[in-house]
């Protein structure tokens, strides 16, 4: 029970499996369960009987339309989390988000907020993002709190605020919550690899237009030259966003390499053609390399001093779902191997 890993392919498992996990946690003496409640889980009634003590809202962007049909249906499923929060529970909301009022109206429990707006329960006063850390000033109950966070990116200033306010809302003392922040590491999220090279390599889970845009905007605030992106789109999933991802990447990155990413039963070439559908006649800073291992190697081989290679879409996942079955594949391991291959060719020893 000291270490638990959910190897289930679903973000939120089916209800019978979920309850078996709860039983296991209870037998181990756990008092709290933190989980991600996906829109699909509400759509498929996996969470129908669960009431939440605490629910946290970050943002809503178009996603999973292959399941929900329309964006309105998607939002309706997202709101179920807050409707299923206990009356004596707490809803932690991003007050700066455009859908804040709609989410607030759905809340069954007490509402507390975070954001830059002066009305926020936990206000983001200011912050400065550095290449290795972020210095943040939050305001809580008229006290300004300085936080030195290992998490990078503007969006993580918000994510950390959400987590901190959530902890405070369930009774964790402020000093105890703050003491945990320096040790936070989120595998597969803004993972800057230790490559000992004049260029940088980062692995991240970003796979939606919004997530990719935020990531690339952050990366270009750093002292880098070119950004080289390796990314694909999943097969048998929301095909509407494929050309949107293509546009976002070529508009915000120096060069893009489109490749496969869990193609499942679809032809990876067809998926890549969907990605470039709206950019093929107007942009030329991209190429298609179907094999993901080859795509990663090509990106590494292209990198020059102060360039950054961004391998996106899978994060710390350890599989690829192909037509022939599921195979082991980890982007971080592949990146390290690609760097080693290049060093060997160039006679670099470290």
Residue ranges with predicted function:
Residues 1-3:
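Short beta-strand-centered segment that lines the nucleotide-binding/catalytic pocket of NTP-utilizing
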Residues 108, 162-174, 179, 184-185, ...:
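ATP-dependent carboxylate-amine ligase
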Residues 13-16, 35-41, 72-76, 182-186, ...:
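Short gly/ser/thr-rich secondary-structure transition/capping motifs
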Residues 35, 55, 93, 113, ...:
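Structural beta-sheet core signal
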Residues 6-38:
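Conserved nucleotide-sensing/catalytic segment adjacent to the nucleotide-binding pocket
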Residues 28, 43, 51-201, 224, ...:
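Acidic, Mg2+-coordinating active-site environments of NTP-dependent enzymes
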Residues 31, 53, 89, 254-256, ...:
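Conserved acidic residues
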């Amino acid at each position: 029970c000291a270490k638990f890993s959910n190897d289930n392919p679903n973000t939120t498992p089916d209800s019978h499996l979920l309850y078996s996990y709860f039983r296991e946690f209870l037998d181990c003496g756990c008092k709290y369960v933190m989980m991600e409640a996906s829109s699909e889980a509400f759509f498929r009634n996996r969470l129908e009987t669960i009431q939440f003590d605490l629910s946290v809202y970050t943002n809503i962007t178009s996603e999973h339309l292959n399941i929900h049909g329309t964006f309105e249906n998607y939002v309706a499923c997202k709101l179920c989390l807050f409707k299923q929060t206990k009356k004596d529970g707490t809803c932690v909301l991003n007050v700066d988000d455009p859908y804040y009022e709609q989410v607030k109206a759905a809340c069954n429990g007490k509402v507390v907020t975070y954001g830059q707006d002066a009305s926020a329960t936990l206000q983001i006063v200011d912050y400065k993002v550095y290449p290795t850390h972020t210095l943040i000033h939050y305001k809580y109950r008229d006290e300004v709190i300085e936080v030195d966070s290992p998490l990078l990116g503007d969006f993580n200033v918000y994510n950390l605020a959400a987590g901190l306010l959530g902890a405070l809302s369930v009774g964790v003392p402020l000093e105890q919550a703050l003491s945990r922040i320096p040790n936070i590491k989120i595998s597969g999220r803004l993972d800057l690899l230790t490559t000992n090279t004049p260029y940088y390599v980062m692995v991240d889970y970003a796979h939606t237009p919004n997530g990719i845009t935020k990531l690339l905007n952050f990366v270009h605030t750093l002292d880098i030259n070119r950004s080289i992106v390796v990314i694909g789109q999943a097969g048998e999933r929301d095909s509407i966003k494929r050309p949107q991802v293509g546009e976002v990447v070529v508009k915000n990155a120096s060069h893009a390499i489109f490749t496969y990413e869990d193609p499942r039963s679809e032809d990876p070439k067809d998926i890549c053609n969907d990605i470039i559908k709206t950019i093929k006649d107007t942009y030329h800073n991209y190429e298609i390399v179907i094999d993901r291992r080859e795509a990663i190697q090509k990106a590494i081989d292209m990198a020059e001093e102060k360039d950054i290679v961004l391998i996106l879409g899978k994060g710390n996942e350890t599989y690829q779902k192909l037509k022939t079955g599921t195979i082991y594949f980890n982007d971080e391991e592949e990146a390290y191997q690609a760097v080693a291959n290049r060093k060997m060719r160039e006679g670099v020893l470290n």
